[in-house]
UniProtKB/Swiss-Prot annotation:
Protein's name according to its UniProt entry: Endoribonuclease YbeY
Cofactor dependence: Zn(2+)
GO molecular function: metalloendopeptidase activity; RNA endonuclease activity; zinc ion binding
GO CC aspect terms: cytoplasm
Pfam families reported for this sequence: YbeY (PF02130)
Gene of this entry: ybeY
Enzyme Commission (EC) number: 3.1.-.-
InterPro entries: MetalPrtase_cat_dom_sf_prd (IPR023091), YbeY (IPR002036), YbeY_CS (IPR020549)
Key words, A-Z: Cytoplasm, Endonuclease, Hydrolase, Metal-binding, Nuclease, Ribosome biogenesis, rRNA processing, Zinc
Locations listed in the record: Cytoplasm
Comment on bound cofactor: Binds 1 zinc ion.
Length: 172
């Protein structure tokens, strides 16, 4: 089971009824089911903040020391590594988690204005762009990153595969 908590700090998000707990749960489940190590954990929790430029700018400054608004920020609750998920049956890090019935994945903050503007510029629906960013962020929460070309290719290929499940074309 996946429990999703959503805080909408910006009224424009309320216009997008399709961005809701059911969608977020469905996307999260689709990502997690790709990794056998998560199958033993019975309950996951994910916190979502739907906010605006001012708040995302503050968060980006505070946590990344970057004075610029961004589309999404991910804050993992656990120090996981994609290699542990992909290349081992049960890594020592994951072994600790598997003994528990519950795992808080982390927090994700989405910025309405940046996502809306990117959607317009890239000629895609804001919902499809949101789904892509959600997939990207969940992958960050479970240890994926794009610090080099190899990591970026692995992460992008996973995103493309998951997006195709939702009928969304590759953004790359």
């Amino acid at each position: 089971m996946i429990n999703v908590e959503i805080i909408r700090n910006y009224d424009k998000w309320r216009e997008h009824k399709q961005i809701n707990k059911a969608l977020i749960k469905k996307v999260t489940q689709n990502v997690l089911l790709r990794f056998d190590n998560f199958s033993k954990i019975k309950q996951f929790e994910l916190s979502i903040l739907l906010t605006n430029t001012a708040e995302i700018l503050t968060l980006n400054k505070q946590f990344r020391n970057i004075d610029k608004a961004t589309n999404v920020l991910s804050f993992p609750s656990n120090k996981l590594n994609w290699q542990d998920l992909c290349f081992s049956n049960v890594s020592p890090k994951l072994e600790l988690l598997i003994g528990y019935d519950y795992m808080h994945l982390g927090d994700i903050a989405f910025c309405y204005e940046v996502i809306y503007n990117e959607s317009y510029e890239q000629q895609k629906t804001s919902e499809n762009h949101f789904i892509h960013l959600l997939i990207h962020s969940i992958l960050h929460l479970i240890g994926f990153d794009h610090q080099n070309d190899t990591e970026a290719n692995i992460m992008e290929n996973l995103e493309i595969e998951i997006l195709s499940y939702f009928g969304i074309a590759s953004p790359y």
